[in-house]
Structures are given as C-alpha cells and as structure tokens.
C-alpha cells in the first residue's frame, strides 16, 4: 500500500490498522493521486470507510519535483516492564495488555511528526 509514496496511520476496524512509511528515496505523491483523500479523518473509497488518523499530505499545486519529504517510522513494543524487588535488580514482568507505538519522524530534521499508540484488546 505504501507504493503511493506517502506515510499514514489508518484505523480500518477496531482490530485492524494499516501503517505505511515512505518514501525514502523518491518523491511523495499528491493527494489527488490517492483518490482525493483528506489528510486525516473519515474517508470512504469503494465500499469501506476508514479513519485516517494521520498522513503526509500534499496538494496538487506543489510541483512534483518539490515533493521531497521523506518520513520514517520507529515501532516500539511495550510488552514488559521492569519491576525489581531491590533498586539495583532487574525483574521483567509482562503487561496484561501490551502496547505498540508507531512514531513517525521527519526524514530531514528527525522531528517527531506523529505517534499512535495501540493497546492489545
């Protein structure tokens, strides 16, 4: 799905998400190349409505040669935490509901652009 050269976090259903990160070495695409979707919010394309939580988004008035906005994503899994009996000890305990965090960063500046946290059901 990331072939359209933009990054996004989309909630498809309560248990299904789609994440893409790109482009890394090529131009982004205009929103008009992607069905004129919004940058975020509800979007229906075909039979399914989805919730675009965040995306890179570029209007068609930007020359294609200027669409050079790389984005990368770091995925962090929080499934255990340290719960030592003594201050200098280590004891890993499982979270009852693990968490995954998708963190999108600007590929040129390294600044955080968006983060989405999901807890297991």
Task: Cite the ranges covered by each PLM segment.
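Long, structured stretches of catalytic cores involved in phosphate-ester chemistry, encompassing
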Residues: 1-121
């Amino acid at each position: 799905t990331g072939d359209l050269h933009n990054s996004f976090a989309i909630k498809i259903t309560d248990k299904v998400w789609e994440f893409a990160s790109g482009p890394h070495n090529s131009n982004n695409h205009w929103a008009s190349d992607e069905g004129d979707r919004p940058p975020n919010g509800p979007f229906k394309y075909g039979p399914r409505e989805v919730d675009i939580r965040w995306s890179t988004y570029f209007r068609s008035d930007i020359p294609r040669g200027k669409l050079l906005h790389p984005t990368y994503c770091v995925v962090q899994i929080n499934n255990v935490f340290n719960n030592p009996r003594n201050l200098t000890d280590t004891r890993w305990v499982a979270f009852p509901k693990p968490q995954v965090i998708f963190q999108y960063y600007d590929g040129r500046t390294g600044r955080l652009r968006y983060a989405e946290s999901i807890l297991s059901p």
